Swiss-Prot record:
The chain crosses the membrane at residues 18-36, 43-60, 108-128, 133-153. Glycans are attached at N63, N86, N185. This is Golgi apparatus membrane protein TVP23. It comes from Saccharomyces cerevisiae (strain ATCC 204508 / S288c). It comes from the Eukaryota.
């Protein structure tokens, strides 16, 4: 009971306690529904509900909570084939100094962003061990959505607007494989943006 009260008091110290609560709930609700949903629903409605919850969390994090809690926003434009990177970023770094980012907001935002894909990864391993292929598909969708959002925010956080590089130009180094002679196609496969573009 004391831990719940301490966590509640921590949330109250946030700059945006209601928004931080929605952010954390957006991460937790799909996981909880994935765990207990099979007790009262068949697979199909559970699958649809979890994917809708994940989509809502993706939208909420990408467009609202990321912007308010850590002052970061990103989007991916796959239509512009002339750019080195299709990421576009908005960051507190490119504007005049404003109110500082609350340490509690930042810490809980980043912890939730990094822990959520790991939890879905554990579920993927469990699905493989128990040979639950259909649930594995659901977990892979969840891993992709949460990891892609985390990757976008990580690149946005690392982006330096005054470095002379275009938006997101140097962000793909984090995901690139090491250069191994004879395996150029493998490293191109790891570069996510080139996967969706015509050569």
């Amino acid at each position: 009971m004391d831990q719940a009260r301490n966590f509640y008091n921590t949330i109250l110290k946030s700059s945006h306690p209601l928004l931080l609560s929605f952010h954390l709930a957006g991460k937790a609700v799909p996981i909880v529904f994935y765990i207990i949903g099979s007790m009262f629903l068949n697979f199909t409605p559970q699958f649809i509900t979890v994917v809708l919850l994940l989509s809502f969390d993706f939208y909420l994090t990408k467009n609202i909570t990321g912007r308010k809690l850590v002052q970061l926003r990103w989007w991916y434009d796959s239509t512009d084939v002339n750019k080195d990177s299709n990421f576009t970023f908005e960051s507190y770094k490119q504007y005049a100094p404003g109110p500082p980012i609350n340490a509690i907001d930042s810490k809980l935002f980043w912890w939730s962003m990094y822990v959520t894909p790991v939890i879905w990864g554990v579920f993927a391993v469990l699905c493989l061990l128990r040979l639950k292929i259909f649930y594995l598909i659901l977990v892979i969708v969840a891993m992709c959505l949460t990891a892609w959002n985390t990757y976008g925010f990580r690149c946005c956080d690392r982006w330096e607007p005054n470095s002379g590089q275009s938006d997101g130009q140097d962000t793909n180094n984090w995901f690139a494989l090491p250069s191994v002679p004879g395996f150029e196609n493998l490293s191109r496969l790891a570069n996510i943006q080139s996967f969706f573009q015509r050569q």
